[in-house]
From Swiss-Prot:
Cofactor(s), names only, from the UniProt record: a divalent metal cation
Keyword Translocase (UniProt): no
Lineage: superkingdom: Bacteria
Stated role: Involved in the regulation of the intracellular balance of NAD and NADP, and is a key enzyme in the biosynthesis of NADP. Catalyzes specifically the phosphorylation on 2'-hydroxyl of the adenosine moiety of NAD to yield NADP.
GO process terms (BP): NAD metabolic process; NADP biosynthetic process
GO cellular component: cytoplasm
Class of this enzyme: transferase
Identification of the protein by name: NAD kinase
Molecular-function GO terms, alphabetical: ATP binding; metal ion binding; NAD binding; NAD+ kinase activity
Stored HAMAP family: NAD_kinase
Organism of origin: Ligilactobacillus salivarius (strain UCC118) (Lactobacillus salivarius)
Name of the coding gene: nadK
Cystine pairs: none
PANTHER family: NAD KINASE
Length: 268
């Protein structure tokens, strides 16, 4: 089996990477960071996000496994003291995986015919730098509302527990092929009206926004940000691609949610 190892630069992560590399070589794995079958990430969710974007053109060929060297993350199933068990599981690999939906973002600009396409694992956001953002929102090709506020967040089911949740969005099980549109500090009064509620969007529907005004928009795609954009239109849709995780002992989603946000009541 060809295995790639992707680590952050924290000392503990680098120690685990070195130990894991030795064990892989002892058991005759091929270390191949360029064309892996399985990518093992060492760190946390941010490390896995970075690995996802590095291998984004190979998602149909690889599966991810996360080893966490800090707190339990949503994408990391193994602790740093369990690498021997991980190697044994990889040796008996049967190719099983669990797959989660991704978000495609299509951006067109006012000053050119260029169109950029991005893919997000968690979410994409749009906001203005210096003042209120005003934008028309279309769902499934039909006008829905004119939004005024700080910005908008479109998230995947796995991303629903990230920035989306801090905005008051719903937590969505990652086996559902849906998107979530959440407003960021919308303005609602006698003059201006928005739904002011998170929306779950069906997989067949595009979310389209046409922002109004100056060229000072910021677009974020996961942890990447793009500044001072002259945006004409952004379309969001469930991607045809998916991310695949090796299914050795993939942690139950609601257990992850309980651990991350509620914890052990007996510990209080």
């Amino acid at each position: 089996m060809r295995v790639g190892i992707f680590s952050n630069n924290v000392r503990r992560s680098l120690e685990v990477k070195a130990a894991l590399t030795r064990r892989f070589l002892e058991r005759h794995f091929i270390i191949d960071d360029e064309n892996p079958e399985v990518v093992v990430t060492i760190g946390g969710d941010g490390t896995l996000l970075s690995a996802f974007h590095k291998y984004i053109d190979m998602l149909d060929k690889i599966r991810f496994v996360g080893v966490h060297t800090g707190h339990l993350g949503f994408y990391t199933d193994w602790r740093d003291d369990e690498i021997d068990d991980l190697v044994i599981s990889l040796q008996s690999d049967n190719g099983q995986s669990v797959s989660y939906p991704l978000l495609d973002v299509f951006v067109t600009y006012k000053d050119s015919n260029k169109r950029d396409v991005f893919t997000a694992l968690n979410e994409a956001t749009i906001r203005r730098i210096s003042s209120t953002m005003v934008t028309d929102i279309f769902i499934g090709g039909e006008f829905f509302e004119r939004f005024r506020g700080d910005g908008l967040c479109v998230s995947t089911p796995t991303g629903s527990t990230a920035y989306n949740k801090s905005l008051g969005g719903a937590v969505v099980h990652p086996t559902l092929d849906v998107l979530q549109l959440t407003e960021v500090s919308s303005i609602n009064n006698r003059v201006f009206r928005t739904l002011s509620s998170p929306m779950i969007i069906a997989p067949k529907d595009w979310i389209t926004i046409e922002p109004e005004g100056a060229a000072d928009f910021i677009l974020t795609v996961d942890s990447d940000s793009y500044h001072k954009l002259k945006i004409k239109e952004i379309k969001f849709k469930i991607s045809k691609k998916k991310i695949h995780f090796a299914k050795y002992r993939h942690t139950h989603f609601w257990h992850r949610v309980q651990t991350a946000f509620i914890g052990d009541e007996d510990a209080d």
